[in-house]
């Protein structure tokens, strides 16, 4: 798609950011709750300091940052809040045409599962209602220092053509969550 704005959530020390900044076609913004990471990134990438923001994506109103503009969400998402990040993206789905991120493998697999599989659940149903999901690849824990106790999985979620549901959306979400 033609979306230029990209929001990286939880950039840490910029392992992904440094490559994203090399892509001239995108307008990259970084958001992190760790002030040490923010200070490090601002000190090491001063040309981008005004787009390195301290804040919590779960508390952010994206309209304050991007207005009505669309933005792509990327990141090596903190595993303890990755599902909440996806639900927040779902809430702003009309502005978020794409999500690309690394998750704990079990979460990534669950999000990408098809109906009928045992992992198919609430997050699968709700995200797949509005996004086409592709499980890209698994990342072994040994590529990280220190290595986590779990594997990671990268998924790509691309907004589908569904703008509205043929039923009350709030009721749909409630029914899926209790089913």
Range-by-range predicted roles:
Residues 1-178:
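Catalytic cores of RNA-modifying enzymes
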């Amino acid at each position: 798609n033609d979306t230029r704005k990209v929001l990286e959530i939880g950039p840490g020390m910029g392992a992904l950011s440094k490559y994203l900044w090399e892509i001239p076609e995108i307008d990259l913004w970084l958001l992190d709750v760790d002030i040490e990471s923010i200070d490090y990134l601002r000190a090491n990438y001063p040309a981008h300091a005004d787009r390195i923001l301290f804040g919590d994506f779960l508390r952010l109103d994206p309209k304050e940052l991007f207005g009505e503009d669309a933005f792509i969400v990327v990141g090596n998402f903190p595993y303890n809040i990755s599902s909440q990040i996806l639900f927040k993206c779902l809430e702003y789905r009309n502005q978020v045409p794409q999500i690309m991120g690394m998750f704990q493998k079990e979460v990534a697999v669950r999000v990408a599962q098809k109906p009928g599989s045992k992992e198919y659940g609430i997050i699968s149903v709700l995200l797949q209602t509005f996004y086409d999901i592709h499980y890209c690849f698994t990342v072994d824990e040994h590529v990280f220092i220190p290595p986590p106790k779990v594997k990671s999985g990268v998924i790509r979620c691309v907004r589908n053509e569904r703008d509205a549901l043929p039923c009350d959306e709030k009721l749909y979400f409630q029914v899926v969550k209790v089913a």
